[in-house]
């Protein structure tokens, strides 16, 4: 058994987006924190978030209204307590973000007072979205990254992937099962390191990379969900994958999102002949929840045999469009399209994982000392469909609550002196990496075709059979060859793909983001789809 380089901290945070960094900054006043980032520290879904953060700042709005809008969007299976918990703590947590230096757009009211410019997005009954033009995530992420990198108690490790969690019972330690650290793949040095930690937090984001078309960056491979499942944690509602209705249809920008706020400010969805179709689908038109809009676009494309639909805001004044959407306007100009003059081609794409690792109000999972916050988690906030701009808010609120719980418990947690080293004595360098590439493409294509916007029981059964075969191939490959970034992500993706399909097969109805032709109606009563591991997987 080889000797493994070792790291040590009070709290290991796996992920460097809004959830991970807000938690790190709250904890670092009293505790030593390590933050893992799979790529450059700012490369994650937070950085690319365009819309904004939902919170009640307008005196005509109310927390009760925010709660009701979220419950309606969630199609009847949100956890009301979780929704009220998030909405009631929203303003305080957004104010904390402002105190860190995040600059949201402001405007001068008719009475001469300056206030935050609030926009409205799908599902919201009021203007309550704080934003920084059309690049809110970039403003949030760069501010938090700067604060974290300059904090003496925070060590940010870039190009570092968590391989797996280290759990106490695998080491023969007495007492409740708890996390004691993790193995980390250092891509810079191409070796596996062992990290001792009193608490470990999964802030790894979602799993939209499991689909062929996604708005997410390449790192969204479901790592935290897969690691938590292997450690023995329950997962829930993974059948609810949000497909953003309006990803740009262009070969040079396949991951580029056209924010919900465009429709909030009056953009229309049109067929290739220029006619609108959303007013015939829903009384809210283009401001209907995302699942309804995405399904409508998918239906129109299939019915017409069209490659895309079109998003048109050219009827608004040019200056208005350029002022409110400067980043999108500039990006489209680079691609030869003028947002102020012409309709823009759009298609739905996998955007957000509404389910995840089951947690409580403090982000606690089923394993002591292991937390999950942000998109990786299932809090009950989103139900069967996430309402726009509640995702960054969820990151902030659970970053705050998890920090309180970790800080409260820290004095009673004792670190483990010796952790098992990573064993590479029986593996060799990969022989044919084409195996990984082939399985990668096959998995993402079958998930898109069989487990996409519209599903059937037969499609799900086909998907599960093929996923099971892929798992066997990938597990064999993982057992015999040294780890690599692509292998780690593929192993996690195929695990999450299985969980998505199993959750989808449990739900004998159509609800929110899960639509199946075999059960097109919504049941009168329903709840979350919860999967429990029979036995935790054995770490290598």
UniProtKB/Swiss-Prot annotation:
The lineage of its organism: Bacteria, Pseudomonadati, Pseudomonadota, Gammaproteobacteria, Enterobacterales. Pfam families: FAD_binding_2 (PF00890), Succ_DH_flav_C (PF02910). It is found in: Cytoplasm. The gene is nadB. Belongs to the FAD-dependent oxidoreductase 2 family. NadB subfamily. The keyword Cytoplasm applies. This is L-aspartate oxidase. Catalyzes the oxidation of L-aspartate to iminoaspartate, the first step in the de novo biosynthesis of NAD(+). It catalyses: L-aspartate + O2 = iminosuccinate + H2O2. Its main location: cytoplasm.
């Amino acid at each position: 058994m080889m000797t493994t380089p070792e790291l040590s901290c009070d709290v290991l945070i796996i992920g460097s987006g809004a959830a991970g960094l807000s938690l790190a900054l709250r904890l670092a006043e009293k505790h030593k924190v390590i933050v893992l980032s799979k790529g450059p520290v700012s490369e994650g879904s937070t950085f690319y978030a365009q819309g904004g953060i939902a919170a009640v700042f307008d005196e005509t709005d109310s927390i009760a209204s925010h709660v009701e809008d979220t419950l309606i969007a969630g199609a009847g299976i949100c956890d009301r307590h979780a929704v009220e918990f998030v909405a009631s703590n929203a303003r305080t947590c957004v104010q904390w973000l402002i105190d860190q230096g995040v600059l949201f757009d402001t405007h001068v009211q008719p009475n001469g007072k300056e206030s935050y410019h609030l926009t409205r997005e799908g599902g919201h009954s009021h203007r309550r979205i704080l934003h920084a033009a059309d690049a809110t995530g970039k403003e949030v992420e760069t501010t938090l990254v700067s604060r974290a990198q300059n904090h003496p108690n925070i060590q940010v490790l870039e190009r570092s992937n968590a391989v797996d969690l280290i759990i106490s019972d695998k080491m023969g330690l007495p007492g409740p099962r708890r996390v004691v650290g993790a193995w980390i793949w250092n891509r810079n040095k191409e070796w596996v390191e062992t990290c001792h930690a009193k608490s470990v937090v999964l802030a790894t984001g979602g799993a939209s990379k499991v689909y062929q078309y996604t708005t997410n960056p390449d790192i969204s491979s479901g790592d935290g969900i897969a690691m938590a499942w292997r450690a023995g944690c329950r997962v829930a509602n993974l059948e609810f994958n949000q497909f953003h209705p309006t990803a740009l249809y262009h070969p040079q920008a396949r991951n580029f999102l056209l924010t919900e706020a465009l429709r909030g400010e009056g953009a229309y969805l049109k067929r290739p002949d220029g006619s609108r179709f959303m007013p015939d689908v829903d009384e809210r038109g283009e401001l209907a929840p995302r699942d309804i809009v995405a399904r409508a676009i998918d239906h129109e494309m299939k019915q017409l045999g069209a490659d895309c639909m079109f998003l048109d805001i050219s009827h608004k004044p040019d200056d208005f469009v350029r002022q409110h959407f400067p980043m999108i306007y500039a990006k489209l100009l680079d691609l030869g399209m003028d947002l102020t003059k012409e309709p823009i081609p759009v298609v739905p794409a996998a955007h957000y994982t509404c389910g995840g690792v089951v947690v409580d109000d403090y982000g606690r999972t089923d394993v002591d000392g292991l937390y999950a916050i942000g998109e990786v988690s299932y809090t009950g906030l989103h139900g069967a469909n996430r309402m726009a701009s509640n995702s960054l808010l969820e990151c902030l609120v659970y970053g705050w609550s998890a920090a309180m719980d970790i800080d409260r418990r820290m004095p009673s947690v004792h670190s483990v002196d010796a952790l098992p080293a990573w064993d590479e004595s029986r593996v060799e360098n990969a022989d044919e990496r084409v195996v990984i590439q082939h399985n990668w493409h096959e998995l993402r294509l079958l998930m898109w075709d069989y487990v996409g916007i519209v599903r059937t029981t037969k499609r799900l059964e086909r998907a599960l059979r093929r996923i099971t075969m892929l798992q066997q191939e990938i597990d064999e490959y993982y057992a015999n060859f040294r780890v690599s970034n692509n292998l780690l992500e593929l192993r996690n993706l195929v695990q999450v793909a299985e969980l998505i399909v199993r959750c989808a097969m449990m739900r004998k109805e159509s609800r929110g983001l899960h639509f199946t032709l075999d059960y097109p109606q919504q049941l009168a009563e329903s709840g979350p789809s919860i999967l429990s591991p029979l036995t935790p997987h054995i770490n290598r």
